[in-house]
């Protein structure tokens, strides 16, 4: 990880945990230099417990550890934001977040739903069925849904179009899971294209030449 310049002159600095995937704020804890160094070394979040007066690895009792993905320091170098992958609920009450905030549904939520279904033993799961049938079945279903999107677009039925796009996206994420493609890879490719200069049609072949 990068070398961080954090001001520990007052002993403790606040450390905010944020879900790396959903960006939900999970909790607030405090770190001293030793806790921060241990977090870097172990790759899991370690706080300094003000009540216990000792280092405290988050989840050391419950097993609900917080794996570190990235660390950010604010402009004053006295507050830390840590992107984590939580291993279970963060709050001692059993809630995902200590702030009880609800995360809006997103494509990351859809990806996680597909992953959870793939790992489940639910024989009635449609996702599980598709993945068991394999790529040929999944691509066939995706093609059918994509065709339905085109049909509804031509018909101009907005409500039906939205419904079919939702179906298509679901099957796309099942296909991505089957191929081992994470949505972050798609985001990275889109970001690459977004930042690429002169990315205009003049660089490409004419359609009739494809």
UniProtKB/Swiss-Prot annotation:
Q: Name one Pfam family in it.
A: PRA-PH
Q: Which reaction does it catalyse?
A: 1-(5-phospho-beta-D-ribosyl)-ATP + H2O = 1-(5-phospho-beta-D-ribosyl)-5'-AMP + diphosphate + H(+); 1-(5-phospho-beta-D-ribosyl)-5'-AMP + H2O = 1-(5-phospho-beta-D-ribosyl)-5-[(5-phospho-beta-D-ribosylamino)methylideneamino]imidazole-4-carboxamide
The family database entries (InterPro entries) matched by this protein are listed as:
His_synth_HisIE, HisE, PRA-CH, PRib-ATP_PPHydrolase-like, PRib_AMP_CycHydrolase_dom, PRib_AMP_CycHydrolase_sf
EC number(s) on file: 3.5.4.19, 3.6.1.31
Annotated compartments: Cytoplasm
Q: Name one GO biological process term.
A: L-histidine biosynthetic process
Major place of residence: cytoplasm
GO terms for MF: ATP binding; phosphoribosyl-AMP cyclohydrolase activity; phosphoribosyl-ATP diphosphatase activity
The reply on keyword Cytoplasm is: yes
| Entry keywords, A to Z | Amino-acid biosynthesis, ATP-binding, Cytoplasm, Histidine biosynthesis, Hydrolase, Multifunctional enzyme, Nucleotide-binding
Report one GO cellular component: cytoplasm
In residue numbers, the region (Phosphoribosyl-AMP cyclohydrolase) covers 1-106
Keyword Hydrolase found:
yes
Annotated region Phosphoribosyl-ATP pyrophosphohydrolase: the residues are 107-210
Q: In which pathway does it act?
A: Amino-acid biosynthesis; L-histidine biosynthesis; L-histidine from 5-phospho-alpha-D-ribose 1-diphosphate: step 2/9; Amino-acid biosynthesis; L-histidine biosynthesis; L-histidine from 5-phospho-alpha-D-ribose 1-diphosphate: step 3/9
Q: Which family does it belong to?
A: In the N-terminal section; belongs to the PRA-CH family.
Question: Which protein are we looking at?
Answer: Histidine biosynthesis bifunctional protein HisIE
Species, as recorded: Staphylococcus aureus (strain COL)
């Amino acid at each position: 990880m990068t070398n961080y310049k954090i001001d520990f002159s007052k002993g403790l600095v606040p450390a905010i945990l944020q879900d790396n995937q959903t960006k939900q704020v999970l909790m607030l804890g405090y770190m001293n230099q030793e806790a921060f160094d241990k977090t870097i070394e172990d790759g899991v979040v370690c706080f300094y417990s003000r009540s216990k007066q000792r280092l405290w690895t988050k989840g050391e009792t419950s097993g609900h550890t917080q794996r570190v993905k990235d660390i950010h320091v604010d402009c004053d170098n006295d507050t830390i934001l840590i992107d984590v992958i939580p291993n279970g609920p963060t709050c001692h009450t059993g809630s995902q977040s200590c702030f009880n905030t609800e995360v809006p549904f997103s494509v990351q939520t859809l990806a996680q739903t597909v992953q959870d279904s793939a790992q489940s033993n639910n024989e009635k799961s449609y996702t599980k069925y598709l993945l068991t049938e394999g790529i040929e079945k999944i691509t066939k279903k995706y093609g059918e849904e994509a065709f339905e999107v085109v049909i509804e677009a031509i018909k101009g039925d907005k409500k039906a179009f939205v419904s079919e796009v939702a179906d298509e996206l679901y099957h796309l994420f099942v296909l991505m899971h089957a191929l081992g493609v994470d949505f972050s890879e798609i985001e990275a490719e889109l970001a690459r294209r977004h930042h690429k200069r002169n990315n205009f049609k003049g660089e490409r072949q004419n359609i009739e030449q494809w």
